[in-house]
Amino acid sequence: MSPSIVFTGGGTAGHVTPNIALIKEFRKEGWNVEYIGSVSGIEKEMIEPLDIPFHGVSSGKLRRYFSLKNLLDPFKIVLGIIQSSLLFYKIKPDVVFSKGGFVAFPVVVGAWLNRIPVVAHESDMSPGLANRLSFPFVNKICLTFDAGKKYFKRQDKIEVTGTPIRQQLLTGNRMKGLELCGFNSSKPCLLVVGGSLGAGSINSCIRSALKQLTSEFQVIHLCGKGKLDSSLVGVEGYCQFEYANEELADLFAASSVVISRAGANSLYEILALGKPHILIPISSQVSRGDQIQNARYFQGLGISVVIQDELLKADVLLQALQDVMRKKDEIDNKIKALKIESATDKIVAIIKEQAHVQTPRIV
């Protein structure tokens, strides 16, 4: 009988894309693969093209701020644990891999209740709430940054591995990307990535500066689901998408510079592709500040140009783009010196190792 694995993680693309990289490796090796995500999260849409069984469970959002919805979330989480536990009793996988996000916690606990080993992964410099809560129930947690070790008590559970990178991103075709947008080679391309859910501040800034931007660049704008601007359809030198999946590799290949949020998964993919970039981390007012930490780290290495979200204006962005283009060769060399590699093989080895280990006592 073939070994089996269940993946979980969702809420945003950053909690799904590393899973996609790993899923493809396990399927190559003949493993049975299934996925547990939230009922209405983006993970279902992203996993669907892989043609693997997807199971939706209830999940609470684990908010860090007051909301009346917080009163219902504990009940949703308990329901998610029960649903996950019943699924695991039926599926009986050898191991579970969790990429975090609010759906992950009930799934991890459900696996623990069924004595199924769990490996988790944290991409950011400081762990998210789901991974902090999940830590007592996992066998191993893989970290992208060594700095993340200080947040966990049991150091024997920790492996610093880096981040899995989708290999298909490294094989994009520049001409296909240009054709997809109706562009040519007359100007460099600027790729704007606001995250899978979009980024209102980035979208507004790009559109307010569009005339100046298109005088220097051809602009590819990934603006998020439901965030397209119909008034800008047909504007020369501007192409907008809600989200890019299979096309993303070609869009990256066509681009000379990238504007992005500073989630660790997206950032590592940008670095693996060697793209000069501007990072606009999510404000600490609406997040735990993880993206700010990521951005500051690479800014300190002289690799990333960073604009704080609260300071984002058209003139600030245009000046930052000039700075990046002026220092492009220097930035290129610094990115190459990092030698960013995918952690897929390392993490696959850890998962296989844990697939033959009993689950830990809660500590």
Curated annotation (Swiss-Prot):
Keywords recorded for this protein, A-Z: Cell cycle, Cell division, Cell inner membrane, Cell membrane, Cell shape, Cell wall biogenesis/degradation, Glycosyltransferase, Membrane, Peptidoglycan synthesis, Transferase
User: Which InterPro entries does the entry link to?
Assistant: GlcNAc_MurG, Glyco_trans_28_C, GlycoTrans_28_N
Gene Ontology MF terms in the entry? UDP-N-acetyl-D-glucosamine:N-acetylmuramoyl-L-alanyl-D-glutamyl-meso-2,6-diaminopimelyl-D-alanyl-D-alanine-diphosphoundecaprenol 4-beta-N-acetylglucosaminlytransferase activity; undecaprenyldiphospho-muramoylpentapeptide beta-N-acetylglucosaminyltransferase activity
Q: What is its main location?
A: membrane
Is Cell cycle a UniProt keyword of this protein? yes
GO annotation terms (biological process): carbohydrate metabolic process; cell division; cell wall organization; lipid glycosylation; peptidoglycan biosynthetic process; regulation of cell shape
Provide the catalytic activity annotation: di-trans,octa-cis-undecaprenyl diphospho-N-acetyl-alpha-D-muramoyl-L-alanyl-D-glutamyl-meso-2,6-diaminopimeloyl-D-alanyl-D-alanine + UDP-N-acetyl-alpha-D-glucosamine = di-trans,octa-cis-undecaprenyl diphospho-[N-acetyl-alpha-D-glucosaminyl-(1->4)]-N-acetyl-alpha-D-muramoyl-L-alanyl-D-glutamyl-meso-2,6-diaminopimeloyl-D-alanyl-D-alanine + UDP + H(+)
Q: In which pathway does it act?
A: Cell wall biogenesis; peptidoglycan biosynthesis
The record, for NCBIfam families, names: PRK12446.1
Task: State the protein's name.
Answer: UDP-N-acetylglucosamine--N-acetylmuramyl-(pentapeptide) pyrophosphoryl-undecaprenol N-acetylglucosamine transferase
Originating species: Legionella pneumophila (strain Lens)
